[in-house]
Swiss-Prot record:
One of its GO terms (biological process) is rRNA processing. Belongs to the endoribonuclease YbeY family. It comes from Azobacteroides pseudotrichonymphae genomovar. CFP2. It comes from the Bacteria. Binds 1 zinc ion. The gene is ybeY. Its main location: cytoplasm. Zn(2+) binds at residues 107, 111, 117. Single strand-specific metallo-endoribonuclease involved in late-stage 70S ribosome quality control and in maturation of the 3' terminus of the 16S rRNA. One of its GO terms (cellular component) is cytoplasm. The lineage of its organism: Bacteria, Pseudomonadati, Bacteroidota, Bacteroidia, Bacteroidales. GO terms for molecular function: metalloendopeptidase activity; RNA endonuclease activity; zinc ion binding. It is found in: Cytoplasm. This is Endoribonuclease YbeY. Its cofactor is Zn(2+).
Length: 139
């Protein structure tokens, strides 16, 4: 099983795929999960809006849309990541672009692991998971 990276209508971000894949797999192990087929699909705001409208009936931009195909402890899914929104949010929150990109990637991975972020208590747990994961990619 593999973690794959592709783009739809955006330039590929300059991340080290090997390190990123190793990091994702380590986070999955931390949650007693295994990697199935996971695809990170980098796209524009226009594309994420189209996907959001078509599949979720939401008429708004977002930084990530996660489609979960997991079965049991084997984690599989597609992560559509809007690079325009990553750039916007990194400036808005005054954080490094790549830190924001990795936060969004792991946010999608945590969704695939069963994390939610609709309720305030769930958002707190999600943020804690993101922060723990980001510590690992920094080291």
């Amino acid at each position: 099983m593999a973690v794959l990276y592709t783009t739809l209508d955006s330039k590929f971000p300059s991340i080290n795929r090997k390190i990123t894949t190793r990091w994702i797999k380590q986070i999955l192990i931390d949650y007693n999960k295994r990697a199935g087929d996971i695809t990170c699909i980098f796209c524009s705001n226009d594309e994420i809006l189209r996907i959001n409208n078509f599949y979720l009936n939401h008429d708004c931009y977002t930084d990530i849309i996660t489609f979960d195909y997991s079965k049991g402890d084997i984690i599989s899914g597609d992560l559509f990541i809007a690079l325009d929104m990553i750039k916007y949010n990194s400036m808005k929150y005054n954080v490094n672009y790549f830190e924001e990109l990795y936060r969004v990637i792991i946010h999608g991975i945590l969704h695939l692991c069963g994390f939610n972020d609709k309720l305030i208590k769930d958002i707190k747990v999600m943020r804690e998971g993101e922060n723990r994961a980001l510590e690992k990619i920094r080291s």
